[in-house]
């Protein structure tokens, strides 16, 4: 619990700036919901999903990357919208 609180404090401090910095989730499993501050000019978050030998996989982060066929991607423009 202390680690989670410390992580949230660090993310808050790092993301404080005079403009708005987008915050996106960057976790792969729902058990470890971590976030990242996107760089200047990045205005979207993404969540992409695909199936492999391990089952359904999901990746999250800043931006809106191009994906290969068979990969589903959802992009959005608000803080933590890719959860």
Curated annotation (Swiss-Prot):
Residues 1-21 form the signal peptide. Expressed by the venom gland. CDD domains: TFP_snake_toxin. GO terms for molecular function: acetylcholine receptor inhibitor activity; ion channel regulator activity; toxin activity. It is found in: Secreted. It comes from the Eukaryota. Dimer. This is Three-finger toxin MALT0066C. It comes from Micrurus altirostris (Uruguayan coral snake).
């Amino acid at each position: 619990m202390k680690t989670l609180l410390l992580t949230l404090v660090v993310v808050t401090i790092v993301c404080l700036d005079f403009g708005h910095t987008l915050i996106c989730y960057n976790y792969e499993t729902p058990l470890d919901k971590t976030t990242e501050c996107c760089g200047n000019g990045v205005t979207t978050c993404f969540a992409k999903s695909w199936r492999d030998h391990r089952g359904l996989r999901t990746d999250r982060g800043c931006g809106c990357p191009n994906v290969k066929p068979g990969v589903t991607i959802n992009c959005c423009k608000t803080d933590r919208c890719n959860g």
